[in-house]
Amino acid sequence: MHDAVVVGAGHNGLVAANVLADQGWSVLVVEAEDEPGGAVRSGELIEPGYVNDRFSAFYPLTAASPVFRALGVQIPFRHGPLVLAHPSLDGTTAVLSRDAAETTMGPSWPEVMERWEQIEPALLRGLVTPFPQVRSALMLALEPSAAKLLRLRPDRLGDRLLLGNALHTDVPPRSILGRAFGLLLTAFGQRYGYPCVEGGSGRITELLVARARARGVDLRLGERLDRLPTARHAVLAAIDVWELARITGRRSRIQRDPATLKLDWTLDGPIPWTSEPAQHAPVVHLGGDRDFVLFGQYSMADPTRSPPGKETAWAYSHVLSAAEIEARIERHAPGFGALVRGRRVEELPAGRVNLGTARWRNQLVLRPFRGRPATGLPNVYLASASAHPGGGVHGGAGWIAAQAALRSASRRRARGLASLTISRT
């Protein structure tokens, strides 16, 4: 019997397996798919020689995450000249750059980033700390810099940047929470960029798998479970809460995030954007509240993704059809359709992208099991994006669940030693 069984070999499950193996535990990872990685996979999805990411594609949270630094995982990030562009048909373009002077957030933005640096450590600690984290949360709420950041009043282009970044989530972008998400992703983009991974996002998974196997972790693929496995110390469920509910027979109260339509393309050349900044930004935002499209173009940042002079790209939307997405791109880049060599369309059902809504009803202590990884089942921990700190490739949920399992085992061991000592006296 293994010390721990991790159900699910997405990045959170692999992070958890690595953390436990580092402490000398024997670990088995069981994955229903025929390959590990979950959302963090890539391949020649459309035609040979062109690499597209299966789901996640750009990684500001990964670049910022203390988890990957703690594990010593060196990810080969690649950046474009700019971070992102959000063009409008009126001829203006909002720009996010790692150079604050190029970012169109207005003249106060450098000062804003100075204030951001004062609160960023507390935010990053939140990625690896379970809630309720009352003291840290109160300290952050009372931090003057945090309050001033939320009162930021950018100009029109800056507001467009915040809006587009907020729309990476399913939160109303002009709400307080939406504004906070928009500011967070804008600031992380300023600090860390929106890098892609050289050769494809699957490289992250390969690095985590190699590290785990070097520490004796057993990885079994293509095994779908109908009941919880047994382990000496802990079972970590790196799966969504609805799959956990299916296995355990318990109901889940978490609300799903919206369905998503994702398109991938192989192209005969770079996208002919009418916006000059969009020609230099791997991430492009199109539209607004009701018709938002998130678009990615890889090869300007990572030439290994396609043959010379060619391009691979992707887009997703929560509200538009495939034809509407392509029509929207064509308006901003006339001639785009003529460059398309091949396309792949995937409809992702509700809950598939972030494993739960990012709205208030599923934040912090309102997340499943009051924001902590314990599930109410003995020694079973939730280690997926359904748990705090939620979606994004940062490894926080896997890290938190693994630390909880280690602490619980240590307490049980201490109680056992205490009982043994008492019985001998």
Q: Model segments located where?
A:
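N-terminal glycine-rich phosphate/pyrophosphate-binding loop and immediately adjacent elements
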Residues: 2-118
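Mid-domain catalytic core of redox enzymes
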Residues: 88, 221-307, 422-424
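Rossmann-like flavin
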Residues: 89-177
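A glycine-rich dinucleotide-binding beta-alpha-beta segment and adjacent secondary-structure elements
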Residues: 158-172, 334-388
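Helical element adjacent to the flavin cofactor pocket in flavoenzyme catalytic cores
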Residues: 183-225
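FAD-dependent oxidoreductase catalytic-site/capping-region signature
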Residues: 298-360
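A conserved FAD-binding loop/helix module that cradles the flavin
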Residues: 383-409
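Active-site-proximal substrate-binding core of FAD-dependent oxidoreductases
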Residues: 407-425
